Amino acid sequence: IDEQISAFNEGMNPSADATVTYNEPMDSFVLRPEVYGTQLDADAVCAKVGECIKAMRTNCELTEDDLIKPKVLSSDSRVMDAVQRANDLFPDSFSLMLNGSVKAATIDKATFAGWLSISPEDYSLSISQDGVASWVNEKAEGMNTVGATRTWTREDGKVCTVSGGTYGWKVDTNSLSQDVYDALVAGGATSVDIPCSQSGDTYNGAGARDWGAYVDVDISEQTARYYDASGNLLHSCGVVTGKPVNGRSTPTGVYYL
């Protein structure tokens, strides 16, 4: 009768154990109660049918006792403890700080929930290191400023845009991934400092000015201007840049001096 039971169960609702789940409106890990389904327990049904055959009965009545039941109930202290540990492990938010004080990215609890898994055997918590690394790699692309397009208002009021160059911030993604993972596993931390393989003077987000004192070489005006970190013009002079033909034009971008 296994085939008949399998066919019957296809249209029935399965049972489910009580477990830990993330509740988005509450922004919290909560207990998801067990579910009592309507699928038949093949072992229980076969045993009852065997008894009916031995008793020479022509019919066999099945009851709720013959349905598959959840094995883990809401009253199980292991589940409640896992809920508490999951909430204790992660604060309301987790910040990634660049240049000491700039919040460059934030991990919210919904994102963290996507990395968290709970063992059905011992209810231990584990965090996906691959999930963390993938998220960090994606965010780091938006933090890096080396070669990025930057727009700023020059001290004389001209709005300037520049792309390319070797100057700027470059996040050490491997180190950052490990730092974030270690902090989340340890629990309780609210931020990590972002390690960089290359840094600038300031950080105001991708696409913004990230330098202090600088020399502005305006190719369109054929003028070089030197500004200090406070924006004071210290020197200005005419320049002759490369001829705008292949191999001779002056490369644009932001570079170290």
Task: Outline where the language-model segments fall.
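Surface-exposed, secretory/extracytoplasmic low-complexity segments enriched in Ser/Thr/Asn/Gly/Pro
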Residues: 1-257
